[in-house]
């Protein structure tokens, strides 16, 4: 090595001299010489270190691994490297040979309990030994032998199936990995491994579906019947309509039974439908930090069957089923069978039966299922796709996903009620005129009655509203509750917030008036219409913003109310006490209603079936807003009584009144609106209270309010509508009730621009409207149905007697 360094030095010196001789710079030559010197020094130091390591290795091996001759003196104790001739010592040293009874840490193959470095041949290569010795010298630690003498565990004979979102994972997971989680730096669970020990055949199967036109309903019934035929099933399957569920959380955060298994049959619509709200709920639950991670891991499993039209809508083929499958998986559900996609045009019933048969065979597999969820899988797949080729993907694969490749509920804005939708057809059939894409107007039966002189609405008795000049309208056909007494029959959309296209308020009002007047014109040829009332009906004076849906959901509700006032139309706004922020910002209205349909949290959920989880807190906040921010408004609590649901606890109702302090409390018995099978409502005629029962409830309610020192009393009634009015005694001026409204004075005050309250536009309540007088408006003739039927029967009998028999033919 020294010879090479000398030769190198001579070469470098010669080159440097030649460089300087031909005019080179001295500084550069100096740098070259210094650099070469440093290089030689480093090379010399490295070789010296290597030699020291080898010497150290030899020194360490001598006492621990000496040969047979040196080990002759270790007969009794068996030295460090005692050999087989001398018995190796009874204790068997740390490097005892195969004769040792207890092989040490480096024993050979003869040791009964081989040590941590046992081997059939030599201990190892010199290089590995040198590295270990160096570590031992620099970092001296105590050697841990606890893992050395542990008995090896037996392997499982069978391994559960693993369903993973990451297809590249083929590892077999043992029984001990029943639950594992990976927690990210933000404290949230990024991945999890869950196991179901329930056998599929012993589970309780729920076939869940959503349907607008009946195809999905028939398909779900077919799946249900097919699964019901399985003799091996322990429990009979159950068939449920998603649209009839009062609370999705009972099934998709909690589970109805411990061994629940879901089979979802879902169509895909290009229009707004109840399925949109279901998907929105799943997405919110998956992204809600207040909801436990993976709540649906309590399920035995789930699978989804999607129905669609791959010919007409290839880009949206089964996209809602894909979304449901995605979000249920994100919530921790175990997919027991692949997502099914059936084209109803080309496949139809045959494909549904084929998918169901394969599902039935899968249910017979009793092996436990492990499902692996990894939140990073989506992002990793997206990165791989982004780094791949620029070829266009299949439209079926990208349908229903956002720009980032993940499912999103806000990727497309739909119309609330499209003209080609079943919802539009159902509403039209029920007598509504749909305005734009989300508003509606309908002529009230009391409007027809007053035009014919057969009576007026209860608002005439209680507040002086002329029914023949009142327009019932809603700027939002969607609602945030699914009340059991609602007459919408499940046809209207539901949502917690606005997610549709928005029509301008000017457009809604203009077309609402046109629609209302067109329906009034249809009354022109009806017998008994009073000409004077018919003429005035074409000048709308009042607008009841109720009808169906939730008007306060409309984003431009304040502008719409102001447009009504500009046309001299009063505003009667009804809300369901579920939107406190919108209620806080509402402008001046003629009268503000808040529906209080139950006095307790449990009963309110049972009656209103609200969509919000914090529905009770929202209602309480709305009551506080009425007492504070909106205390200048003329406020009314509206109670709809349903026997067997909310007529029990008057004390709890009094608590709510004490919290909100409304000016009036309007109590009305529920009206039965036909069959309730369409929207899952449990109401029958047995739940409709008689007028006497309503009076009894109102008297008990008033007594409880007075007992608490709240100044309320029974003021007016409309017995025909099963309706009574409790009013604050401040409206009883000089011993006379003033519950009616002076509408002309209201507009004078409104146009003046000055602040005013509800006490500034009062009008005396007429005698016929007071409690005890029935509330039937004069100038009308009440027609009793029983008498009408009796009279019609008598007229028919008279006609039969007077009509001569036809002549006998020749």
UniProtKB/Swiss-Prot annotation:
Biased segments, Low complexity type: 104-116
Per UniProt, location of the Glycyl lysine isopeptide (Lys-Gly) (interchain with G-Cter in ubiquitin) cross-link in this chain: 496
Recorded metabolic or biological pathway in which this protein acts: tRNA modification; wybutosine-tRNA(Phe) biosynthesis
Family the entry assigns: Belongs to the TYW1 family.
Catalytic reaction equation(s): N(1)-methylguanosine(37) in tRNA(Phe) + pyruvate + S-adenosyl-L-methionine = 4-demethylwyosine(37) in tRNA(Phe) + 5'-deoxyadenosine + L-methionine + CO2 + H2O
Result of altering residue 479 to A: Loss of function
Region (Disordered): 86-116, 156-176, 374-407, 782-810
Domain (Radical SAM core): residue spans on this chain: 463-713
Disulfide bonds: none
Domain named Flavodoxin-like: residues: 205-360
Function per UniProt: Component of the wybutosine biosynthesis pathway. Wybutosine is a hyper modified guanosine with a tricyclic base found at the 3'-position adjacent to the anticodon of eukaryotic phenylalanine tRNA. Catalyzes the condensation of N-methylguanine with 2 carbon atoms from pyruvate to form the tricyclic 4-demethylwyosine, an intermediate in wybutosine biosynthesis.
Amino-acid positions noted as binding FMN in the UniProt annotation, renumbered to this chain: 211-215, 304-337
Keywords annotated in UniProt: 4Fe-4S, Endoplasmic reticulum, Iron, Iron-sulfur, Isopeptide bond, Lyase, Metal-binding, Nucleotide-binding, S-adenosyl-L-methionine, tRNA processing, Ubl conjugation
Cofactor note text: Binds 1 [4Fe-4S] cluster. The cluster is coordinated with 3 cysteines and an exchangeable S-adenosyl-L-methionine.
Compartment(s): Endoplasmic reticulum
Organism from which the protein derives: Saccharomyces cerevisiae (strain ATCC 204508 / S288c) (Baker's yeast)
Cofactor: [4Fe-4S] cluster
Gene Ontology biological process terms, A to Z: wybutosine biosynthetic process
UniProt keyword annotation of Iron present: yes
Residue ranges with Acidic residues bias: 374-397
Protein name: S-adenosyl-L-methionine-dependent tRNA 4-demethylwyosine synthase
GO MF terms, alphabetically ordered: 4 iron, 4 sulfur cluster binding; FMN binding; metal ion binding; S-adenosyl-L-methionine binding; tRNA-4-demethylwyosine synthase activity
